[in-house]
Amino acid sequence: MKPLNNTKKNQRGFSLIELMIVIAIIGILIGVGVAGYKSAIKAANEAAAVKTLRSIADQQMLYFNSHQRNAFGTFEEMRKENLLDSRFDGTTPVVDGYVYTMKVVPKSTTAQPGYTINADPQVATGVSATGKNHYYVDSDTNTIHVNDSQPAAISDPPIGQ
């Protein structure tokens, strides 16, 4: 009778330790990748917000000029004239992770018409943040201002400074 020997000389396959090490490495790579992906999404949303503010400001000038330089339009008025697309339906549209708020000042005997637009992240903090920076533009300066902690205003520095 032959003695029982549980070891085979040419075993094939992976041990449990080797599999656990591979799974741990994959987990680390996924964790790093997700963090980088979320950071890239935030940066893309912020770039889109700046571009969108510039576009709205340009469309406001078209609206202003087509109304005998007497008025700026709300989101709804600009949508009716096809100056903005359907993403801007409503009074506070959300586009690419940013909430846009516009205030229009009508022309009066004491003031010229004007507007201000704020673009604020839909979610400003946490894992699901859609952006960090808050942006502002108005009809007087047509310069985009930025604040990294609260809604931006004209007193905040312009982008790039």
Labelled PLM ranges:
Residues 58-131, 139-143, 158-161:
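Extracellular/periplasmic head regions of type IV pilus-like filament subunits
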Residues 20-36:
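Alpha-helical hydrophobic helix detector
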Residues 1-14:
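N-terminal leader/signal peptides at the extreme start of proteins
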Residues 34-53:
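Aliphatic-rich helix starts adjacent to a transmembrane/signal segment
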Residues 151-154, 159:
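A short acidic/small-residue loop/turn micro-motif
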Residues 143-151:
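Short, exposed beta-strand-loop hairpins at the edges of beta-sheets
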Residues 13-21:
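Secretory/exported precursors with cleavable N-terminal leaders
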